[in-house]
Amino acid sequence: MLIKITQGAPYGVATGADGALWFTLTEPGAIGRLVPGEEPVVHRLDPADGGPTVIAPGPDGAMWFTEFRGNRVGRITPDSEVTSYEADSPYGIVAGPDGAMWYASMRSDRIGRIAADGRRAEFTLPVVGGMPSGIAAGDDGALWFTLNQAGTVGRITVDGETTLHPLPTEGAAPVHITAGPDGALWFAEIGAGQIGRVTPEGKITEYPLPDRACRPHAIITGPDGALWYTAWATSRLGRITTGGAIRELDLPGAEPHGLTTGPDGAIWVALESGALARVTP
Protein backbone atom coordinates (compact mmCIF):
# COMPACT_ATOMS: atom_id res chain seq x y z
CA MET A 1 0.00 0.00 0.00
CA LEU A 2 1.20 3.48 -0.88
CA ILE A 3 0.18 6.68 0.92
CA LYS A 4 0.96 9.77 -1.15
CA ILE A 5 2.42 12.74 0.71
CA THR A 6 1.72 15.77 -1.45
CA GLN A 7 3.46 18.28 0.83
CA GLY A 8 6.99 16.98 0.31
CA ALA A 9 9.39 14.04 0.22
CA PRO A 10 9.49 11.83 3.35
CA TYR A 11 12.99 11.01 4.59
CA GLY A 12 12.83 9.62 8.14
CA VAL A 13 9.92 7.82 9.78
CA ALA A 14 9.27 6.48 13.29
CA THR A 15 6.37 5.31 15.42
CA GLY A 16 5.35 7.46 18.36
CA ALA A 17 3.93 6.64 21.76
CA ASP A 18 0.62 8.09 20.53
CA GLY A 19 0.19 5.23 18.05
CA ALA A 20 0.91 7.38 15.01
CA LEU A 21 3.61 7.40 12.36
CA TRP A 22 5.77 10.51 12.38
CA PHE A 23 7.92 11.45 9.40
CA THR A 24 10.31 14.19 8.30
CA LEU A 25 10.01 16.23 5.12
CA THR A 26 13.47 17.60 4.39
CA GLU A 27 11.85 19.84 1.82
CA PRO A 28 9.88 22.01 2.59
CA GLY A 29 11.04 21.65 6.22
CA ALA A 30 8.17 19.96 8.00
CA ILE A 31 7.15 17.12 10.29
CA GLY A 32 4.25 14.88 9.34
CA ARG A 33 1.97 12.66 11.38
CA LEU A 34 -0.10 9.76 10.06
CA VAL A 35 -2.55 7.56 11.90
CA PRO A 36 -3.01 4.47 9.69
CA GLY A 37 -6.39 4.70 8.00
CA GLU A 38 -6.56 8.49 8.29
CA GLU A 39 -5.21 11.42 6.28
CA PRO A 40 -1.68 12.68 7.01
CA VAL A 41 -1.24 15.96 8.88
CA VAL A 42 1.84 18.07 8.15
CA HIS A 43 3.30 20.71 10.49
CA ARG A 44 5.64 23.17 8.78
CA LEU A 45 8.60 24.15 10.95
CA ASP A 46 9.56 27.74 11.68
CA PRO A 47 12.19 28.38 10.49
CA ALA A 48 11.74 25.82 7.72
CA ASP A 49 15.30 25.81 6.39
CA GLY A 50 16.78 23.22 8.76
CA GLY A 51 16.36 20.12 6.61
CA PRO A 52 14.73 17.73 9.13
CA THR A 53 16.18 14.26 8.62
CA VAL A 54 16.04 11.50 11.25
CA ILE A 55 13.20 11.23 13.79
CA ALA A 56 12.84 9.05 16.89
CA PRO A 57 10.48 8.68 19.87
CA GLY A 58 11.63 10.12 23.17
CA PRO A 59 11.01 8.78 26.68
CA ASP A 60 8.82 11.84 27.30
CA GLY A 61 6.11 10.90 24.78
CA ALA A 62 7.34 13.49 22.26
CA MET A 63 9.14 12.91 18.96
CA TRP A 64 12.69 14.17 18.56
CA PHE A 65 14.26 14.97 15.21
CA THR A 66 17.48 16.32 13.75
CA GLU A 67 17.80 19.34 11.48
CA PHE A 68 21.15 18.78 9.82
CA ARG A 69 21.29 21.99 7.81
CA GLY A 70 19.85 24.10 10.60
CA ASN A 71 22.23 22.81 13.29
CA ARG A 72 19.31 22.00 15.55
CA VAL A 73 17.65 19.12 17.36
CA GLY A 74 13.89 19.52 17.53
CA ARG A 75 11.17 18.16 19.77
CA ILE A 76 7.52 17.98 18.75
CA THR A 77 4.61 16.94 20.98
CA PRO A 78 1.48 15.12 19.78
CA ASP A 79 -0.30 18.50 19.67
CA SER A 80 2.48 19.91 17.42
CA GLU A 81 4.26 22.11 19.98
CA VAL A 82 7.86 22.44 18.79
CA THR A 83 11.01 23.19 20.80
CA SER A 84 14.47 23.51 19.25
CA TYR A 85 17.95 23.02 20.70
CA GLU A 86 21.27 24.08 19.21
CA ALA A 87 23.41 21.20 17.93
CA ASP A 88 26.17 21.03 15.32
CA SER A 89 25.17 19.11 12.14
CA PRO A 90 23.10 16.41 13.89
CA TYR A 91 21.97 13.38 11.89
CA GLY A 92 21.11 10.15 13.73
CA ILE A 93 19.17 10.40 16.99
CA VAL A 94 17.92 7.88 19.56
CA ALA A 95 16.65 7.67 23.13
CA GLY A 96 19.41 6.52 25.45
CA PRO A 97 19.25 4.24 28.51
CA ASP A 98 19.69 7.29 30.77
CA GLY A 99 16.45 9.02 29.74
CA ALA A 100 18.24 11.52 27.45
CA MET A 101 18.31 11.81 23.66
CA TRP A 102 21.62 11.06 21.96
CA TYR A 103 22.65 12.23 18.50
CA ALA A 104 25.52 11.90 16.04
CA SER A 105 27.13 15.19 15.00
CA MET A 106 28.34 14.64 11.44
CA ARG A 107 30.72 17.53 10.89
CA SER A 108 32.22 17.90 14.36
CA ASP A 109 33.22 14.29 15.14
CA ARG A 110 31.13 14.30 18.29
CA ILE A 111 28.32 12.39 19.95
CA GLY A 112 25.83 14.65 21.69
CA ARG A 113 23.38 14.25 24.53
CA ILE A 114 20.28 16.33 25.31
CA ALA A 115 18.55 15.84 28.66
CA ALA A 116 14.80 16.21 29.12
CA ASP A 117 15.34 19.72 30.52
CA GLY A 118 17.36 20.76 27.46
CA ARG A 119 20.82 20.56 29.02
CA ARG A 120 23.30 19.49 26.36
CA ALA A 121 26.68 17.75 26.50
CA GLU A 122 28.98 16.65 23.70
CA PHE A 123 31.72 14.03 23.62
CA THR A 124 34.58 14.43 21.13
CA LEU A 125 35.50 11.20 19.36
CA PRO A 126 39.12 10.04 18.88
CA VAL A 127 38.97 10.42 15.09
CA VAL A 128 39.07 13.35 12.66
CA GLY A 129 36.72 13.51 9.68
CA GLY A 130 34.96 10.29 10.64
CA MET A 131 31.45 11.65 9.97
CA PRO A 132 29.32 10.17 12.78
CA SER A 133 26.03 9.17 11.18
CA GLY A 134 23.70 6.59 12.72
CA ILE A 135 23.24 5.92 16.42
CA ALA A 136 21.39 3.23 18.39
CA ALA A 137 20.96 2.12 21.97
CA GLY A 138 22.47 -1.30 22.58
CA ASP A 139 21.27 -3.99 24.95
CA ASP A 140 24.53 -3.50 26.88
CA GLY A 141 23.47 -0.08 28.20
CA ALA A 142 25.74 1.85 25.82
CA LEU A 143 25.18 3.82 22.63
CA TRP A 144 26.51 2.48 19.33
CA PHE A 145 27.23 4.67 16.32
CA THR A 146 28.66 4.58 12.82
CA LEU A 147 31.55 6.60 11.42
CA ASN A 148 30.69 6.81 7.74
CA GLN A 149 33.98 8.17 6.40
CA ALA A 150 36.18 6.24 8.83
CA GLY A 151 34.58 2.86 8.01
CA THR A 152 34.09 2.21 11.69
CA VAL A 153 31.43 1.29 14.25
CA GLY A 154 31.84 2.79 17.70
CA ARG A 155 30.51 2.34 21.21
CA ILE A 156 30.12 5.09 23.79
CA THR A 157 29.00 4.74 27.39
CA VAL A 158 26.71 7.30 29.01
CA ASP A 159 29.85 8.63 30.72
CA GLY A 160 31.57 9.23 27.38
CA GLU A 161 34.01 6.30 27.28
CA THR A 162 34.53 5.35 23.63
CA THR A 163 35.63 2.18 21.84
CA LEU A 164 36.08 1.96 18.05
CA HIS A 165 35.74 -1.12 15.83
CA PRO A 166 37.13 -0.63 12.28
CA LEU A 167 35.27 -2.59 9.60
CA PRO A 168 37.08 -5.20 7.47
CA THR A 169 35.77 -3.91 4.13
CA GLU A 170 37.46 -0.81 2.76
CA GLY A 171 34.99 1.92 1.79
CA ALA A 172 32.12 0.29 3.69
CA ALA A 173 30.69 3.72 4.67
CA PRO A 174 28.25 2.54 7.36
CA VAL A 175 25.16 4.70 7.85
CA HIS A 176 22.27 3.61 10.05
CA ILE A 177 22.58 1.13 12.92
CA THR A 178 20.07 -0.70 15.10
CA ALA A 179 19.97 -3.11 18.02
CA GLY A 180 19.21 -6.60 16.78
CA PRO A 181 17.08 -9.30 18.41
CA ASP A 182 20.24 -11.33 19.09
CA GLY A 183 22.00 -8.81 21.34
CA ALA A 184 24.27 -7.60 18.52
CA LEU A 185 24.17 -4.33 16.58
CA TRP A 186 23.31 -4.41 12.87
CA PHE A 187 24.19 -1.68 10.39
CA ALA A 188 23.92 -0.77 6.71
CA GLU A 189 27.13 -0.39 4.67
CA ILE A 190 26.03 2.00 1.93
CA GLY A 191 29.43 2.03 0.23
CA ALA A 192 29.99 -1.74 0.11
CA GLY A 193 26.45 -3.01 -0.44
CA GLN A 194 26.52 -5.08 2.72
CA ILE A 195 24.72 -5.49 6.03
CA GLY A 196 27.07 -5.67 8.99
CA ARG A 197 26.78 -7.13 12.47
CA VAL A 198 28.92 -6.38 15.52
CA THR A 199 28.70 -8.10 18.88
CA PRO A 200 29.15 -6.23 22.18
CA GLU A 201 32.65 -7.73 22.28
CA GLY A 202 33.49 -6.22 18.88
CA LYS A 203 33.30 -9.28 16.61
CA ILE A 204 32.24 -8.14 13.14
CA THR A 205 30.43 -10.13 10.43
CA GLU A 206 29.49 -8.73 7.02
CA TYR A 207 26.79 -10.03 4.67
CA PRO A 208 27.06 -9.05 0.98
CA LEU A 209 23.71 -8.15 -0.57
CA PRO A 210 22.46 -9.58 -3.90
CA ASP A 211 23.23 -6.29 -5.68
CA ARG A 212 26.35 -4.72 -4.20
CA ALA A 213 25.43 -1.39 -5.83
CA CYS A 214 22.05 -1.20 -4.05
CA ARG A 215 23.20 1.46 -1.51
CA PRO A 216 21.62 0.10 1.72
CA HIS A 217 20.69 3.01 3.94
CA ALA A 218 18.46 2.44 6.98
CA ILE A 219 17.93 -0.68 9.08
CA ILE A 220 15.58 -1.75 11.89
CA THR A 221 14.59 -4.87 13.78
CA GLY A 222 11.18 -5.97 12.52
CA PRO A 223 8.27 -7.53 14.43
CA ASP A 224 9.18 -10.94 12.97
CA GLY A 225 12.61 -11.10 14.62
CA ALA A 226 14.50 -10.31 11.41
CA LEU A 227 16.32 -7.17 10.31
CA TRP A 228 14.75 -4.98 7.60
CA TYR A 229 16.68 -2.50 5.49
CA THR A 230 16.14 -0.06 2.65
CA ALA A 231 18.13 -0.29 -0.58
CA TRP A 232 18.11 3.26 -1.89
CA ALA A 233 19.63 2.76 -5.36
CA THR A 234 17.45 -0.22 -6.33
CA SER A 235 14.18 0.92 -4.68
CA ARG A 236 13.89 -2.26 -2.66
CA LEU A 237 13.06 -3.30 0.88
CA GLY A 238 15.27 -6.07 2.21
CA ARG A 239 14.99 -8.60 5.00
CA ILE A 240 17.91 -10.45 6.60
CA THR A 241 17.62 -13.04 9.35
CA THR A 242 20.09 -13.27 12.20
CA GLY A 243 21.47 -16.30 10.36
CA GLY A 244 22.19 -14.25 7.24
CA ALA A 245 19.34 -15.37 4.94
CA ILE A 246 18.38 -12.48 2.64
CA ARG A 247 15.34 -11.67 0.52
CA GLU A 248 14.33 -8.42 -1.14
CA LEU A 249 11.04 -6.90 -2.29
CA ASP A 250 10.45 -4.25 -4.93
CA LEU A 251 8.83 -1.13 -3.51
CA PRO A 252 5.99 0.71 -5.28
CA GLY A 253 7.97 3.95 -5.28
CA ALA A 254 11.49 5.32 -5.50
CA GLU A 255 14.29 6.41 -3.17
CA PRO A 256 13.52 4.58 0.09
CA HIS A 257 15.25 5.95 3.17
CA GLY A 258 13.91 5.58 6.72
CA LEU A 259 11.70 2.74 7.91
CA THR A 260 9.89 1.70 11.07
CA THR A 261 7.56 -0.92 12.49
CA GLY A 262 4.19 0.79 12.54
CA PRO A 263 1.50 0.65 15.23
CA ASP A 264 -0.30 -1.87 13.01
CA GLY A 265 2.64 -4.31 12.96
CA ALA A 266 3.54 -3.53 9.34
CA ILE A 267 6.81 -2.15 8.00
CA TRP A 268 6.45 1.47 6.88
CA VAL A 269 9.02 3.01 4.55
CA ALA A 270 9.67 6.68 3.78
CA LEU A 271 10.05 7.25 0.04
CA GLU A 272 11.68 10.45 -1.17
CA SER A 273 9.58 10.14 -4.31
CA GLY A 274 6.74 11.50 -2.15
CA ALA A 275 5.03 8.68 -0.27
CA LEU A 276 4.96 6.26 2.64
CA ALA A 277 4.86 2.58 1.71
CA ARG A 278 3.28 -0.11 3.90
CA VAL A 279 4.59 -3.68 3.68
CA THR A 280 3.28 -6.67 5.63
CA PRO A 281 6.20 -8.67 7.09
Named regions from a protein language model:
Residues 15-18, 57-60, 95-98, 137-140, ...:
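Residue-level detector of Asp-centered blade-edge/turn motifs that repeat once per structural unit
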Residues 2-7, 44-48, 84-88, 124-128, ...:
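Surface loop/turn motifs at the tips and blade-to-blade linkers of beta-strand repeat domains
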Residues 34-38, 76-80, 114-119, 156-161, ...:
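Short loop/turn segments that connect beta-strands within beta-propeller blades
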Residues 9, 51, 69, 89, ...:
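Beta-rich catalytic cores
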